[in-house]
Each structure stands twice: as structure tokens, then as C-alpha cells.
UniProtKB/Swiss-Prot annotation:
Null mutant phenotype: Altered seed morphology and delayed seed germination as well as inhibited root elongation in the dark; an exogenous carbon source is required to recover from the delayed seedling establishment. Reduced levels of glutamine, pyroglutamic acid, aspartate, beta-alanine, fumaric acid, glyceraldehyde and ribose, but increased accumulation of serine, glycine, asparagine, 3-cyanoalanine and 5-methylthiopentanitrile.
Motif (Microbody targeting signal): 121-123
GO biological process, one term: intracellular lipid transport
Expressed in which tissues: Expressed in most tissues including seedlings, cotyledons, inflorescence, leaves, stems, roots, siliques and flower buds, with the highest levels in floral tissues and in maturing seeds.
Domain SCP2, chain residue ranges per copy: 16-113
Subcellular location as annotated: Peroxisome
Annotated function: Enhances the transfer of lipids between membranes in vitro. Active on phosphatidylcholine (PC), 1-palmitoyl 2-oleoyl phosphatidylcholine (POPC) and ergosterol, and, to a lower extent, dimyristoyl phosphatidic acid, stigmasterol, desmosterol, beta-sitosterol and steryl glucoside. Inactive or poorly active on palmitic acid, stearoyl-coenzyme A, cholesterol, glucosylceramide and ceramide. Required during seeds and seedlings development.
Name of the molecule in the record: Sterol carrier protein 2
Matches recorded under Gene3D superfamilies: SCP2 sterol-binding domain
Gene: SCP2
């Protein structure tokens, strides 16, 4: 079951495209951090898929980060990540409700806002 198809996979693909646009380049210049996002199909900590959202280089990759240490790590269930990425749930609310776990720099985590995702019209 490690090859589970996540709804988040499509969002990450769109994000990869988004970061190559002018709007995406603005995000990269503004934030300049590296985030690790762990997405679990059903339960946090189980069968998680790891994505690296590199807002220094403007890249999204699947798997572990090869460039040292990430600035912050976020863990979500698939459905909760989709809600945050599409603007249906605010990241702060997700954290308060326990739908998102954070490790790493708090100042880096505070820059994890809906602005980094493609606009909902594309989702």
C-alpha cells in the first residue's frame, strides 16, 4: 500500500508548474526557504509521502532533501493538505485543530501561507 495515490500529488504537480511562472518566482524571492511536507493517506506518521518544496530554487521534488537541513517540516493527512492548499482551511487553523504538525523553525513556519500555492481557480 506504499504506492497509494494521494489527492495531494496533483496539487504538488500544479505547484511545480506554478513555481516556474512569474507569480511563482515572486514567491520564491519573497520566502527563500525549504519546506518538507509529509503527507499521509489516512493517519499521520503512517505511509507518509515526503515532498520537498524548495522556495530557494523554485522546485518541488518527491523524496528526502539532499541539500542539508530543511527550514521547517509539516505533516498532514492527505485531505487536510488539500484543504489548506485550496484555501478551504487556514494553516494556523489546521495547526490549532491538530490537522497539521510542525517541526523546525517557527519563523520559517509562519511564512507557510496560502500565498505559496497556486490560486484555487487552477485547482
Amino acid at each position: 500500500m506504499a504506492n497509494t495515490q494521494l489527492k495531494s500529488d496533483a496539487i504538488m504537480d500544479m505547484m511545480k508548474e506554478h513555481l516556474s511562472t512569474d507569480a511563482g518566482k515572486e514567491v520564491t524571492e519573497k520566502i527563500g526557504l525549504v519546506y518538507q511536507i509529509n503527507i499521509a493517506p489516512k493517519k499521520l506518521g503512517f505511509e507518509e509521502v515526503t515532498y520537498i518544496v524548495d522556495l530557494k530554487k523554485g522546485e518541488v521534488t518527491k523524496g528526502k532533501y539532499e541539500g542539508g537541513k530543511v527550514d521547517a517540516t509539516f505533516s498532514f493527512k492527505d485531505d487536510d493538505f488539500v484543504k489548506v492548499a485550496t484555501g478551504k482551511m487556514n494553516p494556523q487553523m489546521a495547526f490549532i485543530r491538530g490537522a497539521m504538525k510542525i517541526k523546525g523553525s517557527l519563523s520559517a513556519a509562519q511564512k507557510f501561507t496560502p500565498d505559496i500555492f497556486p490560486k484555487p481557480s487552477k485547482l
